[in-house]
Amino acid sequence: MEQKEVQRRPAEELFREELDALKAAEQYEVPAGWNMSPRSVLTYILGGKAGDVEITPKYIGDRRIVEIAVATLMTDRSLLLIGEPGTAKSWLSEHLTAAINGDSSRVVQGTAGTTEEQIRYSWNYALLIAEGPSERALVKTPIFRAMEEGKIARFEEISRCAPEVQDALISLLSEKRVSIPELNREQAAARALSLISTANT
């Protein structure tokens, strides 16, 4: 089958040359679970040079906002980007995740219909019926995978979700673990777990 040209590639593919150049030219300490130092993340977002490679700016705005965002993520805390529609919140979220983890695909899109299952875990019901609760039947959400791997997950439009879903997310992030009673186990968050959420004002 013929491979079709995609409309939009993820940031880590689109800017792979720049990301590789920054990693190759790295001179500063890289935090656990990160692909590059906070200083290199800032260079990737705001522009500069890495060796002979020109790093294009991804965000044209207040440098301090990006510095605070990177500092927050260094402490394994979650980050909420709030602003008017069209002010590059999702764009910044994707590029921060691409620079820090090299994978911006762990995304939950918030809507009025988003359920707790979409932030915790759900089940493959065919497998669940066939063999009962099992690891094979467990369907891991992007946030669950981020907890397992100690990575960053992204939650777009969190303010569109019902309050009970937001409460469940806050509980999950404060406890840093997900209980799976059907399997009689818990999934604890690996070091470096963070969540970047966006919300419109």
Residue ranges, per PLM feature:
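AAA+ P-loop NTPase catalytic core and its hallmark functional loops
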Residues: 2-201
